[in-house]
Amino acid sequence: MRKLLIASLLLAVCMVAMAQVTMTIDAKKRGPQIGQYHNGLFFEEINHAGDGGLYAELVSNRSFEDGLSNWSAYNGAVIAQTTKNLLNGAQTNALGVDISGASSSNKKGVANSGYWGMNIQKDSTYTLSLWIKGSSTFNGKITAELRSQDGNQTLGTAVLSGTVNTVKWNKLTATIKATASDKKGQLLLLTGINGHLDIDVVSLFPYTWKNRRNGLRPDLAQLLADTRPAFLRFPGGCYVEGEGSYDNAFQWKKTIGPIE
């Protein structure tokens, strides 16, 4: 009891002593000058700060490094990850798609849900590209559709330009103008032709900050630019050393050039 009383008295004394502390501020007196390089930005690829965040790419897992994550078969198509006859040495996986029972009125294919859905805005234009190779039985076109989250509404559609080659990988492209909006939309790649397809590096971009190719989200990038940073630390944090191993650490030299 005596020890408890002493402890209580000491605590009370400390609180009184803290309460007596005062601070005086002279608003007319200028303090130390802050250097022009004191404030800047720090970027670490964590919690989707880049992919799904500042980076404007709408397709999640576009090169299938994460297996079939965010990809699904549509209308009875059969999909599987493949590591054979890849696009190039930089790629480690591709998506194999087997289609049977398809027709012009019964198209089949694959869907990508993006990062928590794709924010599709009416009257906005989206740039689509992908690499593809087909079997000898495939001879047709690929149609891209932007769909609502529930799949019941088409938000935009386009036929990809280019040829599906049976010997080598070819790049197909399309521009899609949205006719309706859905903050959690999805991308569908469809065909009415039966056969086998290998697909890789599927990319869908909205308008980017300063209209730069393969660029940044305009809203987020402009907010950062408006802070007028003196510098950008990139990469920052543990991202620079990789996840568990230096083998997957960020290597900026490998980011130069086409995304594929």
Go through each PLM region and give its residues.
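Bacterial Sec-dependent N-terminal signal peptides
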Residues: 1-21
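Extracellular and organelle-lumenal recognition/adhesion modules and their flexible linkers in secreted
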Residues: 20-260
